[in-house]
Amino acid sequence: MSKIDSVLIIGGSGFLGLHLIQQFFDINPKPDIHIFDVRDLPEKLSKQFTFNVDDIKFHKGDLTSPDDMENAINESKANVVVHCASPMHGQNPDIYDIVNVKGTRNVIDMCKKCGVNILVYTSSAGVIFNGQDVHNADETWPIPEVPMDAYNETKAIAEDMVLKANDPSSDFYTVALRPAGIFGPGDRQLVPGLRQVAKLGQSKFQIGDNNNLFDWTYAGNVADAHVLAAQKLLDPKTRTAVSGETFFITNDTPTYFWALARTVWKADGHIDKHVIVLKRPVAICAGYLSEWVSKMLGKEPGLTPFRVKIVCAYRYHNIAKAKKLLGYTPRVGIEEGINKTLAWMDEGL
């Protein structure tokens, strides 16, 4: 067992999933690539992806279903499973428990039952965030007792289950990766949202003083880290140091929070000569007011105290462990990643 013979990517039809397909497609020797998802693969791929869809085997199913999961693993004959399926932020807390906790429990159980050797789990850098500043955090930072939100709470629970499932005596090795601020082609939230802000004429507003450093990570780099983790777990010489461990994954270039937004806006020709700064305490009060008004009107609030805290917090991480043990180096820089994302958006897919 020294190479990836067959990989099953759970959540492979999603944003990160497409980048995972690309990274596994590009390695040599190329493994059999299988996708398990409740959604079909996109009918039309962006030019940013070069893999051949005909080479990808698709399995439709529910990751909380033991039968669906077992059938997909057995049919794929996967010796590596990558679990990146997760609902997006801002949804009902119940869906996070169903997918992130119950779904992950089922994935672990079926991997063990079917004799899978490697499980790589996509966690989140947000599992250590509770609204307080995060300065150069490494993997020794504790999970907070009071989580920031249901998404990160359930991600932390799932991560813990995956790490505790690591069992070298049964030839089952696990690892959890914690990417921060993912963006790239296929992103339906971050960059598209920033573009919409500019179109609405709101790019002149800034929440916070913009002195807070923040980690953004290109999706292709995150996918690359998953491939490296799988390879290290398959190698008898490196698996002991990697199995049962967590790793922060970033672009290793913390930037001031609003720098990415302004890079996007600049690329689109939106350059504001004057910026209106809304200080953090004022913005939090405005967030509470927005929530109250939106609740009265039965609408989703645009500004919330939660969003203000995220925008104003320091959140950057130390990836020395990933560099040393995984051999991870971000290959696509922030500006190049933004350009790739904008090019994808301009395709209108």
Curated annotation (Swiss-Prot):
Membrane topology designation: Peripheral membrane protein
Binding locations of substrate: 124, 151
Top-level EC class as recorded in UniProt: oxidoreductase
EC number(s) on file: 1.1.1.170
Regulation: Inhibited by FR171456, a natural product with broad antifungal activity.
CC per GO annotation: endoplasmic reticulum; endoplasmic reticulum membrane
Pathways involved: Steroid biosynthesis; zymosterol biosynthesis; zymosterol from lanosterol: step 4/6
Localisation per UniProt entry: Endoplasmic reticulum membrane
Catalytic site: 155
Amino acids binding NADP(+): 11-17, 62-63, 84-86, 151, 155, 179-182
Major subcellular location class: endoplasmic reticulum
Catalytic activity from the UniProt record: 4beta-methylzymosterol-4alpha-carboxylate + NADP(+) = 3-dehydro-4-methylzymosterol + CO2 + NADPH
Any one GO biological process: ergosterol biosynthetic process
Keyword annotations from UniProtKB, A to Z: Endoplasmic reticulum, Lipid biosynthesis, Lipid metabolism, Membrane, NAD, NADP, Oxidoreductase, Steroid biosynthesis, Steroid metabolism, Sterol biosynthesis, Sterol metabolism
InterPro entries membership: 3Beta_OHSteriod_DH/Estase, Lipid_A_modif_metabolic_enz, NAD(P)-bd_dom_sf
One Gene Ontology MF term: 3-beta-hydroxysteroid dehydrogenase [NAD(P)+]/C4-decarboxylase activity
Record text on subunit structure and interactions: Heterotetramer of ERG25, ERG26, ERG27 and ERG28. ERG28 acts as a scaffold to tether ERG27 and other 4,4-demethylation-related enzymes, forming a demethylation enzyme complex, in the endoplasmic reticulum.
Membership in a protein family: Belongs to the 3-beta-HSD family.
Comment field (misc): Present with 2580 molecules/cell in log phase SD medium.
Its biological purpose: Sterol-4-alpha-carboxylate 3-dehydrogenase; part of the third module of ergosterol biosynthesis pathway that includes the late steps of the pathway. The third module or late pathway involves the ergosterol synthesis itself through consecutive reactions that mainly occur in the endoplasmic reticulum (ER) membrane.
Database matches in PANTHER family: BIFUNCTIONAL POLYMYXIN RESISTANCE PROTEIN ARNA, SHORT CHAIN DEHYDROGENASE_REDUCTASE FAMILY 42E, MEMBER 2
Protein name: Sterol-4-alpha-carboxylate 3-dehydrogenase ERG26, decarboxylating
Biological source species: Saccharomyces cerevisiae (strain ATCC 204508 / S288c) (Baker's yeast)
Lineage: Eukaryota, Fungi, Dikarya, Ascomycota, Saccharomycotina
